[in-house]
Amino acid sequence: MAIEAPVNFAPPERSTVVSTAGDSSTWQPSSLRMHVIRPKSAKGRKRPNLHRPQGMGDGSPSALSSSPPPRSSGSPSNQKPGVCATVSTSQGAPDEMPELLLQQAPTRTASSLNRYPVLPSINRRSLEVGAVDTVASKTSSLQLSSVQALYQEDSSQEDSRTQVCALEKKFIIRTKRQSSSRASNIEEPSDEEPRLLLAVRSPSGQRFVRYFRPSDDLQTVLEVAEQKNKATYQHCSIETMEVPRRRFSDLTKSLQECGILHKSVLGISQEEGEAWP
Protein backbone atom coordinates (compact mmCIF):
# COMPACT_ATOMS: atom_id res chain seq x y z
CA MET A 1 0.00 0.00 0.00
CA ALA A 2 1.39 3.39 -0.96
CA ILE A 3 2.06 6.20 1.60
CA GLU A 4 0.17 9.46 1.20
CA ALA A 5 2.49 12.37 1.63
CA PRO A 6 0.97 15.87 2.16
CA VAL A 7 2.27 18.52 -0.12
CA ASN A 8 2.48 22.18 1.05
CA PHE A 9 2.68 24.85 -1.58
CA ALA A 10 4.41 28.10 -0.76
CA PRO A 11 2.49 31.34 -1.55
CA PRO A 12 3.50 32.89 -4.83
CA GLU A 13 4.41 36.25 -3.26
CA ARG A 14 7.09 34.75 -1.06
CA SER A 15 8.89 33.03 -3.91
CA THR A 16 12.32 34.43 -4.61
CA VAL A 17 12.89 32.46 -7.79
CA VAL A 18 12.51 34.44 -10.95
CA SER A 19 10.82 32.48 -13.69
CA THR A 20 12.53 32.23 -17.03
CA ALA A 21 11.10 32.17 -20.48
CA GLY A 22 11.63 28.40 -20.74
CA ASP A 23 9.50 27.58 -17.62
CA SER A 24 6.01 26.34 -18.23
CA SER A 25 3.14 28.70 -17.35
CA THR A 26 0.98 25.79 -16.10
CA TRP A 27 1.64 23.50 -13.23
CA GLN A 28 2.36 19.87 -14.19
CA PRO A 29 1.31 17.23 -11.64
CA SER A 30 3.82 14.62 -10.70
CA SER A 31 3.32 10.99 -11.44
CA LEU A 32 3.39 10.17 -7.71
CA ARG A 33 0.21 9.47 -5.87
CA MET A 34 -0.62 12.56 -3.71
CA HIS A 35 -3.47 13.62 -1.46
CA VAL A 36 -4.14 17.37 -1.05
CA ILE A 37 -5.74 18.71 2.16
CA ARG A 38 -8.42 21.20 1.29
CA PRO A 39 -8.34 24.56 3.11
CA LYS A 40 -10.93 25.67 5.63
CA SER A 41 -14.08 27.30 4.45
CA ALA A 42 -15.05 30.88 5.25
CA LYS A 43 -17.13 29.74 8.23
CA GLY A 44 -14.20 27.91 9.79
CA ARG A 45 -15.43 24.38 9.13
CA LYS A 46 -13.45 21.80 7.26
CA ARG A 47 -14.81 20.77 3.95
CA PRO A 48 -15.62 17.06 3.41
CA ASN A 49 -13.02 14.97 1.62
CA LEU A 50 -13.62 14.26 -2.01
CA HIS A 51 -14.29 10.61 -2.84
CA ARG A 52 -12.42 9.39 -5.82
CA PRO A 53 -14.20 7.08 -8.25
CA GLN A 54 -13.08 3.44 -8.26
CA GLY A 55 -11.98 3.24 -11.88
CA MET A 56 -9.54 6.21 -11.52
CA GLY A 57 -5.82 5.55 -11.38
CA ASP A 58 -3.41 6.65 -8.71
CA GLY A 59 -1.50 9.05 -10.79
CA SER A 60 -4.46 10.67 -12.59
CA PRO A 61 -4.65 14.44 -12.48
CA SER A 62 -8.29 14.32 -11.34
CA ALA A 63 -7.18 13.00 -7.93
CA LEU A 64 -6.03 16.46 -7.09
CA SER A 65 -8.73 18.71 -5.60
CA SER A 66 -7.47 21.88 -7.13
CA SER A 67 -4.45 23.16 -8.93
CA PRO A 68 -2.25 25.73 -7.25
CA PRO A 69 -2.44 29.31 -8.50
CA PRO A 70 -0.10 30.25 -11.33
CA ARG A 71 3.24 31.57 -10.35
CA SER A 72 3.57 35.22 -11.09
CA SER A 73 6.59 36.46 -12.86
CA GLY A 74 8.71 39.12 -11.34
CA SER A 75 10.06 40.02 -7.95
CA PRO A 76 7.92 40.32 -4.79
CA SER A 77 8.38 44.07 -4.82
CA ASN A 78 6.45 44.33 -8.11
CA GLN A 79 3.36 42.75 -6.62
CA LYS A 80 0.46 45.03 -5.64
CA PRO A 81 -0.25 45.66 -1.97
CA GLY A 82 -3.94 44.88 -2.43
CA VAL A 83 -3.14 41.25 -3.28
CA CYS A 84 -0.96 40.94 -0.19
CA ALA A 85 -3.70 42.38 1.99
CA THR A 86 -6.22 39.93 0.54
CA VAL A 87 -3.95 36.95 1.12
CA SER A 88 -3.15 38.06 4.67
CA THR A 89 -6.83 38.47 5.51
CA SER A 90 -7.64 35.02 4.07
CA GLN A 91 -4.92 33.48 6.21
CA GLY A 92 -6.11 35.15 9.44
CA ALA A 93 -8.50 33.79 12.03
CA PRO A 94 -12.26 33.71 11.25
CA ASP A 95 -13.10 35.96 14.22
CA GLU A 96 -10.80 38.71 12.98
CA MET A 97 -12.29 38.75 9.49
CA PRO A 98 -15.08 41.34 10.09
CA GLU A 99 -12.71 43.76 11.85
CA LEU A 100 -10.17 43.52 9.05
CA LEU A 101 -12.86 44.00 6.46
CA LEU A 102 -14.11 47.08 8.30
CA GLN A 103 -10.59 48.47 8.48
CA GLN A 104 -10.02 47.86 4.79
CA ALA A 105 -13.37 49.37 3.77
CA PRO A 106 -12.84 52.83 2.27
CA THR A 107 -14.16 55.62 4.47
CA ARG A 108 -16.39 58.06 2.68
CA THR A 109 -15.84 61.67 3.56
CA ALA A 110 -18.67 63.82 4.83
CA SER A 111 -18.19 66.32 2.06
CA SER A 112 -19.17 63.75 -0.57
CA LEU A 113 -22.57 63.31 1.12
CA ASN A 114 -23.42 67.01 1.02
CA ARG A 115 -25.36 68.04 -2.01
CA TYR A 116 -24.75 71.76 -1.57
CA PRO A 117 -21.48 73.51 -0.75
CA VAL A 118 -20.73 74.28 2.88
CA LEU A 119 -21.61 77.82 3.94
CA PRO A 120 -18.89 79.94 5.50
CA SER A 121 -18.88 80.06 9.30
CA ILE A 122 -20.31 83.15 10.99
CA ASN A 123 -17.82 85.19 12.97
CA ARG A 124 -19.03 84.92 16.54
CA ARG A 125 -16.71 87.62 17.72
CA SER A 126 -18.30 90.17 15.41
CA LEU A 127 -21.73 89.18 16.74
CA GLU A 128 -20.55 89.60 20.33
CA VAL A 129 -19.07 93.00 19.53
CA GLY A 130 -22.32 94.06 17.88
CA ALA A 131 -24.33 92.88 20.90
CA VAL A 132 -22.04 94.79 23.26
CA ASP A 133 -22.40 97.93 21.14
CA THR A 134 -26.20 97.67 21.15
CA VAL A 135 -26.28 97.14 24.92
CA ALA A 136 -23.97 100.12 25.44
CA SER A 137 -26.09 102.36 23.20
CA LYS A 138 -29.30 101.30 24.99
CA THR A 139 -27.67 101.93 28.38
CA SER A 140 -26.48 105.38 27.33
CA SER A 141 -29.94 106.26 25.98
CA LEU A 142 -31.57 105.09 29.22
CA GLN A 143 -29.10 107.12 31.28
CA LEU A 144 -29.74 110.18 29.12
CA SER A 145 -33.51 109.80 29.47
CA SER A 146 -33.22 109.35 33.25
CA VAL A 147 -31.01 112.45 33.50
CA GLN A 148 -33.51 114.44 31.44
CA ALA A 149 -36.37 113.23 33.64
CA LEU A 150 -34.46 114.22 36.79
CA TYR A 151 -33.62 117.61 35.29
CA GLN A 152 -37.25 118.22 34.40
CA GLU A 153 -38.36 117.16 37.87
CA ASP A 154 -35.79 119.43 39.50
CA SER A 155 -36.80 122.33 37.27
CA SER A 156 -40.48 121.78 38.10
CA GLN A 157 -39.66 121.65 41.81
CA GLU A 158 -37.64 124.84 41.52
CA ASP A 159 -40.50 126.54 39.69
CA SER A 160 -42.96 125.49 42.38
CA ARG A 161 -40.57 126.69 45.08
CA THR A 162 -40.15 130.05 43.39
CA GLN A 163 -43.93 130.38 43.09
CA VAL A 164 -44.37 129.56 46.78
CA CYS A 165 -41.67 132.02 47.72
CA ALA A 166 -43.30 134.71 45.60
CA LEU A 167 -46.67 134.06 47.24
CA GLU A 168 -45.10 134.17 50.70
CA LYS A 169 -43.41 137.46 49.87
CA LYS A 170 -46.67 138.93 48.63
CA PHE A 171 -48.49 137.75 51.77
CA ILE A 172 -45.80 139.19 54.02
CA ILE A 173 -45.90 142.51 52.20
CA ARG A 174 -49.68 142.58 52.39
CA THR A 175 -49.70 141.79 56.11
CA LYS A 176 -47.09 144.47 56.72
CA ARG A 177 -49.19 147.01 54.86
CA GLN A 178 -52.31 145.97 56.76
CA SER A 179 -50.51 146.16 60.09
CA SER A 180 -49.09 149.55 59.24
CA SER A 181 -52.50 150.83 58.14
CA ARG A 182 -54.11 149.32 61.24
CA ALA A 183 -51.48 150.93 63.44
CA SER A 184 -52.20 154.23 61.80
CA ASN A 185 -55.92 153.64 62.35
CA ILE A 186 -55.39 152.79 66.03
CA GLU A 187 -53.93 156.22 66.58
CA GLU A 188 -56.43 158.83 67.66
CA PRO A 189 -57.52 161.26 64.97
CA SER A 190 -56.46 164.88 65.15
CA ASP A 191 -58.72 167.81 65.88
CA GLU A 192 -58.97 168.68 62.21
CA GLU A 193 -60.34 165.23 61.25
CA PRO A 194 -63.91 164.12 61.78
CA ARG A 195 -64.12 162.07 64.96
CA LEU A 196 -66.49 160.41 67.42
CA LEU A 197 -66.12 160.26 71.18
CA LEU A 198 -67.01 156.75 72.36
CA ALA A 199 -67.03 155.03 75.73
CA VAL A 200 -66.11 151.33 75.52
CA ARG A 201 -66.79 148.76 78.26
CA SER A 202 -64.80 145.52 78.33
CA PRO A 203 -66.22 142.11 79.40
CA SER A 204 -64.39 142.46 82.71
CA GLY A 205 -66.25 145.75 83.45
CA GLN A 206 -63.37 148.14 82.71
CA ARG A 207 -64.19 151.28 80.75
CA PHE A 208 -62.20 153.79 78.69
CA VAL A 209 -63.06 156.84 76.58
CA ARG A 210 -61.46 157.55 73.27
CA TYR A 211 -61.89 159.31 69.90
CA PHE A 212 -62.49 157.20 66.77
CA ARG A 213 -62.95 158.08 63.12
CA PRO A 214 -66.31 157.35 61.53
CA SER A 215 -64.47 155.20 58.96
CA ASP A 216 -62.98 152.91 61.64
CA ASP A 217 -64.49 149.43 61.83
CA LEU A 218 -65.60 147.54 64.91
CA GLN A 219 -62.44 145.38 64.78
CA THR A 220 -60.39 148.54 65.40
CA VAL A 221 -62.47 149.29 68.47
CA LEU A 222 -61.85 145.73 69.74
CA GLU A 223 -58.10 146.01 69.18
CA VAL A 224 -57.92 149.31 71.03
CA ALA A 225 -59.76 147.70 73.96
CA GLU A 226 -57.31 144.76 74.00
CA GLN A 227 -54.40 147.22 73.93
CA LYS A 228 -55.86 149.33 76.75
CA ASN A 229 -56.82 146.38 78.97
CA LYS A 230 -53.84 144.17 77.94
CA ALA A 231 -56.12 141.25 77.20
CA THR A 232 -57.22 139.10 74.26
CA TYR A 233 -60.87 138.77 73.34
CA GLN A 234 -62.10 135.93 71.15
CA HIS A 235 -65.55 135.20 69.71
CA CYS A 236 -66.73 138.64 70.64
CA SER A 237 -69.49 140.93 69.48
CA ILE A 238 -70.16 144.62 70.08
CA GLU A 239 -73.53 146.01 71.20
CA THR A 240 -74.93 149.43 71.97
CA MET A 241 -76.04 150.37 75.52
CA GLU A 242 -78.94 152.69 74.62
CA VAL A 243 -82.45 151.44 74.23
CA PRO A 244 -83.20 149.60 72.04
CA ARG A 245 -79.93 147.68 72.10
CA ARG A 246 -78.28 146.64 68.88
CA ARG A 247 -75.76 143.87 68.58
CA PHE A 248 -73.12 143.56 65.84
CA SER A 249 -71.29 140.27 65.28
CA ASP A 250 -69.74 141.33 61.94
CA LEU A 251 -66.73 143.34 63.07
CA THR A 252 -65.77 144.37 59.55
CA LYS A 253 -68.46 147.04 59.42
CA SER A 254 -67.51 150.64 60.04
CA LEU A 255 -68.99 152.87 62.76
CA GLN A 256 -70.73 154.96 60.15
CA GLU A 257 -72.36 151.85 58.62
CA CYS A 258 -73.59 150.68 62.01
CA GLY A 259 -75.13 154.15 62.73
CA ILE A 260 -73.18 154.79 65.91
CA LEU A 261 -73.44 158.45 66.99
CA HIS A 262 -71.15 160.83 68.88
CA LYS A 263 -70.83 160.13 72.66
CA SER A 264 -72.23 156.62 72.43
CA VAL A 265 -71.50 153.77 74.84
CA LEU A 266 -70.39 150.42 73.38
CA GLY A 267 -70.05 147.17 75.24
CA ILE A 268 -67.89 144.16 74.27
CA SER A 269 -69.68 140.91 75.01
CA GLN A 270 -67.81 137.60 74.87
CA GLU A 271 -69.90 134.62 73.89
CA GLU A 272 -67.61 131.77 74.99
CA GLY A 273 -65.24 131.95 77.94
CA GLU A 274 -63.73 134.99 79.48
CA ALA A 275 -61.04 137.41 78.59
CA TRP A 276 -57.49 136.05 78.42
CA PRO A 277 -55.05 138.01 80.54
Swiss-Prot record:
CDD domains: UBX_UBXN10. Residues 1-102 are annotated as: Disordered. Keywords: Cell projection, Cilium, Cilium biogenesis/degradation, Phosphoprotein. Residues 35-50 have a biased composition (Basic residues). GO terms for biological process: cilium assembly. It comes from the Eukaryota. Residues 191-268 form the UBX domain. One of its GO terms (cellular component) is intraciliary transport particle B. Residues 60-77 have a biased composition (Low complexity). The keyword NADP does not apply. It is found in: Cell projection, Cilium. The keyword Oxidoreductase does not apply. SUPFAM superfamilies: Ubiquitin-like. VCP/p97-binding protein required for ciliogenesis. Acts as a tethering factor that facilitates recruitment of VCP/p97 to the intraflagellar transport complex B (IFT-B) in cilia. UBX domain-containing proteins act as tethering factors for VCP/p97 and may specify substrate specificity of VCP/p97. Interacts with CLUAP1; the interaction is direct and mediates interaction with the intraflagellar transport complex B (IFT-B). Interacts with VCP; the interaction is direct. This is UBX domain-containing protein 10.
